[in-house]
Amino acid sequence: YYNMRGIDITEKCADFDVFFENASCPKISIGDGGNEIGMGNVELNLSSLKIKPSTTECDELLVADVSNWGAHGLIAMLSTLQNKDYLAAWENDKTLHMLSELGAVDGVSGKRTQTEDGFTSKETKIVINNLRKLSGFR
């Protein structure tokens, strides 16, 4: 496994590819740096970049500037389809704090900060609020 900067992080990661590849349900992946499970769908498109992309494929690939933001977008779509504001209760600060306490690092800086690919929680909250507006909930 490699992070988005091409650094080998295999010893710090669990091998989920085998579960993903053997799952019988539809597989949705969200990626932003090319190294995420599912980015194998666009491996040829990534070959000219100076990264080591994931080769694992998925059924549906959602590419976003920040993977977490792509997940929020997917949740916003589900909110619209089910007419329920699933993002209303999302507590980004608490989530980032918990992840940092457990040893997670920012994907861009590689440091244990309460940020997402270099973006502050405040910036993520703006994205979430905009998604909620687009979904008709703000």
Model regions and ranges:
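An acidic, phosphate/nucleotide-engaging active-site surface
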Residues: 1-18
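Catalytic cores of nucleophile-dependent amide-cleaving enzymes
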Residues: 14-47
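C-terminal functional extensions of proteins
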Residues: 34-138
